[in-house]
């Protein structure tokens, strides 16, 4: 958490150092969303706030152009409603070549969603 001290901070780490389960645990602690993008053996993790991660269409297109895949993101909360992809989630996924991503809640439960 010290590498992501506040919303809108990001860090690049090696792939084996962080998983979506880790981000789910951070979400449970902070109440904030986190997004993870993977390129080769590195992962870009971005800390959001209580309602969103600040990745717009332009940023998503840039990340896709740099070769990143959207591994997934978290939604704060403990029920299955937290696992529903928003229209914004689907719009961001449209920027990437792959067709699916995942949403994790604060309990570590997840759901795969499509564009």
Summary of predicted features, one role per range:
Residues 1-67:
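Glycine-rich short-loop/terminal segments
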């Amino acid at each position: 958490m010290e590498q992501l001290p506040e919303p809108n901070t990001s860090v690049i780490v090696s792939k084996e150092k962080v998983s979506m389960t880790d981000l789910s645990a951070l979400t449970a602690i902070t109440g904030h969303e986190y997004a993870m993008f993977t390129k080769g053996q590195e992962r870009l993790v971005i800390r959001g706030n209580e309602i969103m991660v600040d990745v717009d269409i332009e940023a998503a297109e840039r990340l896709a152009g740099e070769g990143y895949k959207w591994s997934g993101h978290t939604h704060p909360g403990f029920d299955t409603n937290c696992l529903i992809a928003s229209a914004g989630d689907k719009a961001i996924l449209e920027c990437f070549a792959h067709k699916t991503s995942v949403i994790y809640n604060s309990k570590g439960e997840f759901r795969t969603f499509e564009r």
